[in-house]
Amino acid sequence: MSERRPAATTARYLAQPHEVHRVVLLYSGGLDTSVMLKWIQDEYDAEVVALCIDLGQPTDDFEAIRQKALDLGAVASIVMDAKQEFVRDYVGPAIRANARYQGTYPLFTALGRPLLAKLAVEAARAHDADTIAHGCTGKGNDQVRIEATVVTLAPELKVIAPVREWQMGRDEELAYAREHGIPISSSAERPYSLDDNLWGRSSEGGVIEDPANIVPDDVCRLVTLPGLAPDRDEDVVITFRDGLPVALDGQQMDLVELIQKAAEIAARNGVGIMDNVEDRVVGLKVRDIYEVPAAELILRAHKELEKLVFTGRQNRIKAFVDAEWAQLCYEGLWYEPTLADLNAYIASASAVVEGDVTVRCYKGGATVVARSSPYGLYDKSLATFDADSSFAQNASPGFIELFSLQSRMAHQIRQAVEDR
């Protein structure tokens, strides 16, 4: 293994070796964080409390993860089920905000990181730890999201980011694991880096890194490939109240269960695969493959319902608010006052986002085919092309003359000046 880089001093919250006695490590049970657990003990001579947080990511056995950390020397190992908090305080607001970074990415990782950091802070205080450690790289967004949250909520705590300190590639990590008796799962040998929770899944690295490459089929493990999806379409009715989904096909359920059910429906129909290039906070342009079946289904339905119940001005303003909300979330600024201000507006606007939306799923497509709401502003008697429409068409010419006044004047005056 290469020597550890000298501890950086670019920020006051970064831990120096003499300051570290007990560390809360955000632990997944995978190769990276298992190596970190041993590495922190060796390099910092510190105790480690392993914290594994369930945000709905698929896993074989959380108890096995808890025990693995203890076997590797953790003084305590905690598994916390945070799915309800995740959907209530993070995913729910994201649904109301139609949250998609740069118009595409539904922000599932970005939504989870502030919660992980918040719970790590709580665990550090409960276990008398002085430092929090995470497995994020120095090239990614997650280091920003986690560390910004930690220093905001707990300025007394220090942070360790082992991946920024050590000089190990994947092969060196595997060698370190073998040398230190760390069990290696078969998934650790896969060429892709994975991250997932209840709201979505990402794959990056390997052949994915080059945007000129066509990604092989084996990357997608959550969503059925569209070509292999059923040959018949499937309709699902999503009921919203106060801007949040509350029922599928008339069956009411809590948001965790609803997201899980929506994911099943969308995934089996090939809905929710995204091949995405985006701009990271740190300045890099990167490519990821996202599998977001529930998010694609729910966000598409929610946006269409808003279009039905909002005025034109509300729709324009909401689009701007949503884009700013997504940007702040992506950047990890969960405690930025502006986000609270945006949430207040969104909550007020969402009071009328109520009704049913029917989405038709077919071989990768999710199309809204019907929508209804007691607050809908669509009036068939006005909009119809039939002769008995109640819309006062004869009033239109006067409106057009006034509506176009300044545009007409500007064009005509400027044309006259140019013609002189």
What are these regions (language model features)?
Residues 2-26, 31-420:
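Nucleotide-activated chemistry modules centered on ATP-dependent adenylation/adenylyltransferase
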